């Protein structure tokens, strides 16, 4: 049985940890059951944003008349857009080749599962198995679509974001599409296909669209979807699916009054959220503690309850975003392989995780919503500024009082004037959010304890100090510890730090 200094399960954000371990001359095993690069690069952030950007341009051209630009027709070439997308996805094949060149790295193609606290079994596509052991094990397995139990759904067939970017990818836009789920994934797909001419019906269990956004943003986006003739049914229980005359028919009922409706479409996209892969990983064999949903519990140093095992990314249940996973990976790589004194260890914080939904227009936020801040006991005041109130906003075509007039909303602590949250809906909201992200991370921070019962001896000691960290606002190193919404264009400025020769 082969033994490694480091075993890494998953090749998304965990590649940051792999690179640090390789540079530190550790023997490394990398295990991947799918395509290298993880969800984001292959079936998430990157391919969806290529489709979203094309959809944005379609909308902008169609709406150019209010700027005095008249276009007779728009031809959307789905095949050409798709070729660009697949070209980008296929670039990820080089990631495996990159890691295979290192003498201290072994790449395993297969599904990882625990045998015990130090042993991992790899099962390949031919059902052959091999067991390896590791001194340090990094879990970064991501998540998968949560498919609800709906009568007839399996028999009628459906797609998810995973299968969509695979064999189920359509050669042309669907004529009609039902989307189950009104979170970021469902709303982005609704925008894309609506722009390309698909009749889209969105069915949402929650009483709000994009329920993790501030209520003002949710209301704005619902209005925009309705204006674009996306049919939205909120507060619905999905009851059953059947197929008739080549169409899929979904029956749902209002959760308040029980009224049933039926919606018809060529295809159904299931996107109500994600769940972890703990069952496939067999976390119980390693004695790993998980929460009620199956996510691996981690502390502020990404330690699990099992010494020598860490978890990052979607699998730990904390904000399923690639930029959050990158931030965690940078933190873990620093702590494990930088050879810094433990007093220089970094910790993760989740009170300042930016989030962006790439609809038309974009939504972006960081920190508390108005409602959550009030619930937490803050005395809250807000400030709202609309796009139309700025010269550039007017130049873009926004007018005061118009239904599409986007805005920035600040949620403030009335007593201290501290910014508690920022919420933006409008063009390039993801870029406009970045200055606030930087503000949230600058200055002196004190360790925030998570999962107090999970504590290595080092973690316990650092908590008692308590550990603090100062991030100067003009230091290039501060950029390394500041989250940047992925894949916003603000990465162009924030990631320039990687070209600093002494990084």
Residues covered by each model-derived region:
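Glycine-rich dinucleotide-binding loop and its adjacent helix/turn
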Residues: 45, 141-199, 203, 231, ...
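Flexible, glycine-rich terminal cap/loop adjacent to redox cofactors
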Residues: 4-14, 20-34, 39, 46, ...
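Beta1/beta-strand and adjacent pyrophosphate-binding region of the FAD-binding site
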Residues: 1-12, 173-183
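Short hydrophobic core segments
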Residues: 7-9, 112, 131-142, 179-180, ...
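FAD-site-proximal beta/loop scaffold in flavoenzymes
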Residues: 154-173, 262-263, 267-342, 435-438, ...
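Glycine-rich flavin
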Residues: 2-4, 20-26, 31-174, 206-210, ...
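A conserved FAD-binding loop/helix module that cradles the flavin
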Residues: 213-214, 220, 312-372, 431, ...
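A Rossmann-like FAD-binding core segment of flavoenzymes
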Residues: 72, 106-109, 113-125, 196-300, ...
């Amino acid at each position: 049985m082969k033994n490694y200094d480091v075993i890494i399960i998953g090749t998304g954000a965990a590649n940051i940890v792999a690179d640090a371990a390789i540079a530190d001359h550790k023997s490394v095993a990398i295990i991947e059951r799918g395509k290298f690069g993880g969800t984001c690069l292959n079936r998430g952030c990157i391919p969806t944003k290529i489709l979203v950007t094309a959809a944005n341009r379609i909308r902008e051209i169609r709406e150019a008349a209010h700027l005095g630009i008249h276009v007779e027709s728009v031809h959307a070439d789905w095949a050409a857009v798709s070729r660009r997308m697949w070209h980008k996805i296929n670039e990820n094949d080089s990631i495996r080749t990159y890691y295979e060149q290192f003498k201290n790295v072994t790449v395993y193609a297969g599904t990882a599962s625990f045998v015990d606290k130090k042993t991992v079994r790899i099962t390949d596509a031919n059902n052959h198995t091999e067991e390896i052991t590791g001194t340090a094990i990094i879990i970064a397995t991501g998540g998968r679509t949560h498919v609800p139990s709906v009568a007839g759904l399996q028999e009628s067939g459906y797609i998810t974001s995973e299968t969509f970017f695979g064999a189920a990818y359509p050669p042309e836009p669907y004529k009609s599409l039902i989307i189950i789920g009104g979170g970021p994934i469902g709303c982005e797909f609704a925008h894309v296909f609506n722009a390309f001419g698909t009749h889209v019906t969105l069915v949402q269990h929650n009483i709000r669209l994009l329920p993790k956004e501030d209520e003002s943003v949710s209301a704005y986006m619902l209005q925009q979807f309705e204006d674009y003739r996306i049919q939205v049914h909120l507060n619905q229980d999905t009851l059953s699916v059947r197929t008739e005359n080549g169409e899929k028919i979904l029956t749902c009922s209002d959760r308040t009054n029980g009224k049933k409706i039926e919606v018809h479409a060529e295809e159904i996209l299931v996107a109500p959220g994600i769940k972890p892969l703990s069952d496939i990983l067999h976390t119980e064999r390693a004695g790993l503690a998980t929460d009620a949903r199956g996510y691996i519990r981690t502390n502020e140093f990404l330690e699990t309850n099992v010494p020598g095992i860490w978890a990052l990314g979607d699998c730990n249940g904390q904000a399923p975003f690639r930029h959050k996973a990158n931030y965690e990976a940078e933190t873990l790589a620093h702590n494990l392989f930088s050879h810094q004194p433990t007093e220089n260890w970094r910790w993760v914080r989740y009170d300042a995780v930016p989030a962006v939904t790439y609809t038309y227009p974009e939504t972006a936020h960081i920190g508390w919503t108005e409602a959550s801040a009030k619930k937490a006991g803050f005395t809250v005041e807000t400030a709202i500024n609309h796009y139309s109130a700025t010269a550039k906003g007017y130049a873009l075509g926004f007018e005061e009082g118009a239904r599409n007039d986007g805005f920035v909303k600040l949620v403030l602590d009335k007593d201290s004037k501290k910014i508690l949250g920022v919420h933006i809906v409008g063009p390039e909201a993801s870029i406009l959010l970045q200055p606030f992200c930087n503000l949230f991370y600058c200055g002196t921070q004190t360790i925030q304890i998570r999962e107090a019962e999970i504590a290595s001896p080092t973690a316990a000691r650092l908590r008692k100090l308590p550990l603090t960290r100062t991030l100067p606002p003009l230091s290039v190193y501060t950029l390394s510890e500041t989250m940047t919404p992925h894949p916003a264009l603000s990465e162009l400025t924030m990631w320039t730090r990687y070209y600093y020769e002494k990084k």
